[in-house]
């Protein structure tokens, strides 16, 4: 019997507070992308709903309470460490709390759209943020 290739599902959460989006810098001591500025992200656990995963990841990585929009901003195929995955990008609105970083990140910023590219946030994420940015 052959072994099936695993297809992971991950979520990325664009957390907004008014007209700014949360961006976090990966820990310099971490194995995965040290120094990379990104949004909240993580794998969906087996049997877990992607929206529940999005809420869980935000709480684990930031300590914030958010409301996650049910309709994803986008989804795309990616790979990490050679493993294929589907990434579902959600938009969330900050409800309460102050950011308390987990060991995964060294710093955070509430950014305006132009700052994302300046920080070196991956272009695919900048495009998703542009689509999700609050109007007005």
What are these regions (language model features)?
Residues 1-22, 43, 74-75, 93:
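Conserved N-terminal beta-strand and adjoining loop/helix that marks the start
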Residues 3-7, 33-36, 80-86, 102-105:
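A generic structural micro-feature
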Residues 5, 13-14, 29, 80, ...:
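Short secondary-structure boundary/capping segments
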Residues 19, 75-98, 109:
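Active-site-adjacent beta-strand/loop module that shapes the phosphate/pyrophosphate-binding cleft
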Residues 20-60:
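Conserved Nudix-box catalytic region and its N-terminal flanking loop in Nudix hydrolases
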Residues 65-74:
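A short coil-to-beta-strand element that immediately follows conserved catalytic motifs
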Residues 91, 100-133:
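NUDIX/MutT-family hydrolases
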